[in-house]
Amino acid sequence: MIFWKTFFQNSTVGESYENNFKKLFLLDKTFDKIELKDVYLSNTKNINLYELEQLCDSVGWVKRPLKKVKIALKHSSIIISLIQKNDSSTRLVGFARATSDNGFNATIWDVVIHPDFQGLGLGKVVMHQLIKQLRQAEISTITLFAEPDVISFYRKLGFIKDPDGVKGMFWYPR
């Protein structure tokens, strides 16, 4: 697997977050009537399951049992969310998580950005934070599964489809 050696040769370990919320300074602009100056990055595992379900529903994902979603979140190594805060409310507008063996490998799951906020670079922000935190934990192999229509997004972030001819395999109950 020579690929992984070259994939991370220029990677650096960054600083960790001191707080659960960090303001995204790069988003101090207005796009199509959406003010992003109140969007915050969070790494708390305390996610409102109903808000997450609404976010996933907004992009057309199949509903999953909340009980299982809760278990998946509990066993996730890293959770990154984007929260829009106003004077009177908060709203989950982005989310992603990773699971890991905490030694070598991690897989990124459930990358989702609300349609009103897509195309503004928020997916990149979430992915960069996940990768940064995984690299801080000295994880050398980061994988993900992608629908065909988003492969180019992940390629721009440095992910490679089928490196060295490696193929993912799945087992499903019959």
Swiss-Prot record:
The keyword Mitochondrion does not apply. It comes from the Eukaryota. Keywords: Acyltransferase, Chloroplast, Plastid, Transferase. CDD domains: NAT_SF. Its EC number is 2.3.1.-. GO terms for molecular function: N-acetyltransferase activity. Pfam families: Acetyltransf_1. The keyword DNA damage does not apply. Its main location: plastid. It is an enzyme of class 2 (transferase). One of its GO terms (cellular component) is chloroplast. It is found in: Plastid, Chloroplast. SUPFAM superfamilies: Acyl-CoA N-acyltransferases (Nat). Residues 42-174 form the N-acetyltransferase domain. Coiled coil: none annotated. Belongs to the acetyltransferase family. Ycf52 subfamily. PANTHER family: ACYL-COA N-ACYLTRANSFERASE, GCN5-RELATED N-ACETYLTRANSFERASE 2, CHLOROPLASTIC. This is Uncharacterized N-acetyltransferase ycf52.
